[in-house]
A protein has these predicted regions:
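Alpha-helical "hinge/linker" immediately C-terminal to small N-terminal DNA-binding modules
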Residues: 7-37
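Secondary-structure junction motif
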Residues: 130-134, 141-166, 241-245, 249-259
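C-terminal effector-binding regulatory domain of bacterial HTH transcription factors
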Residues: 165, 197-206, 216-266
Length: 266
């Protein structure tokens, strides 16, 4: 050991600025690499509330072995908000509903769209209301209904394709954007509702909601579509997306089986 304190040499003092710049560059590169690594781990999905509440989590639970090292971010919203998130690359994958007359127009050079399966908007009510609804003559009493607003996709389908074409008279009891709120409101008897089958599988299975099996209350078919960005990241995740689509189809088809078992003829 020496009694003299260490001191930078003249050469080191001259290079101090260059050394500091080099260290700053190294830190920046390290930070960018870490951020890029984290981004590669995340699969961000946008979906309608009705899809993100029940069927998508069920499907994700079946492909966990493929998700090792990946984190799922599930963003819920209405159809237009989800599509905007996809096109601004806030998410890389979108799951949505379509019908033959209500399709999502996509830029095909940026987005790949595939059909996953079909879902159904089915008429349901609480067990206590089933007998009342069975005795309502078309065009007579007002039937209380719980539904979506008309300015969102599912609301448009219910109001334009089902209520407007029905021989029954309806009175709006409650309106909600969230499928879960409509499920709860219908379950406690605020009114009947048309709800996505995939969202109410458990309620039908356990008798908390009853399917209204009548020509006066038709079923409306929906196509479940998957939209994914044409990026290198999504190319690497193609097997994950394909597996998710397969399991989502199985999940929704399981709900069809529950519907068949729950039919109560009016």
């Amino acid at each position: 050991r020496t009694g003299r304190p260490a001191a930078p040499t003249p050469v080191l003092l001259e290079m101090a600025g260059d050394i500091e710049s080099a260290l700053t560059s190294i830190k920046r590169v390290s930070r960018d690499l870490k951020r890029g690594y984290k981004e590669n781990e995340v699969l961000a999905i946008a979906a309608l509330h009705s899809l993100s509440s029940v069927p998508i989590p069920k499907a994700i639970s079946k492909i966990q072995s493929l998700l090792s090292g990946h984190q799922i971010q599930l963003r819920s919203g209405n159809q237009s908000a989800c599509f905007q998130r996809l096109m601004t690359e806030e998410v890389s994958l979108m799951l949505a509903y379509e019908t033959p007359v209500n399709t999502l127009e996509i830029p095909k050079d940026l987005v790949i769209k595939t059909q996953v399966t079909n879902d159904l908007l089915v008429p349901v009510c609480s067990p206590q209301q089933l007998e009342y609804i069975s005795n309502v003559t078309p065009g007579s009493d007002q039937i209380q209904i719980v539904t979506y607003p008309e300015n969102i996709f599912l609301g448009q389908q219910v109001h334009q394709e089902l209520i407007a074409k029905s021989s029954h008279n309806f009175t709006q009891k409650l309106r909600a954007e969230m499928t879960s709120a409509i499920v709860s409101s219908t379950q406690v008897g605020l009114g009947m509702a048309w709800l996505p089958l995939s969202s109410i599988e458990d309620e039908l299975k356990h008798g908390l909601l009853k399917f209204i099996d009548s020509p006066c209350f038709p079923i409306h078919e929906l196509t479940v579509s998957m939209l994914r960005l044409r990026t290198k990241k999504m190319e690497k995740l193609a097997s994950v997306c394909n597996a998710l689509a397969v399991e989502l189809e199985k999940t929704i088809q399981d709900a069809y089986k529950v519907l068949e078992r729950s039919r109560v003829k009016l």
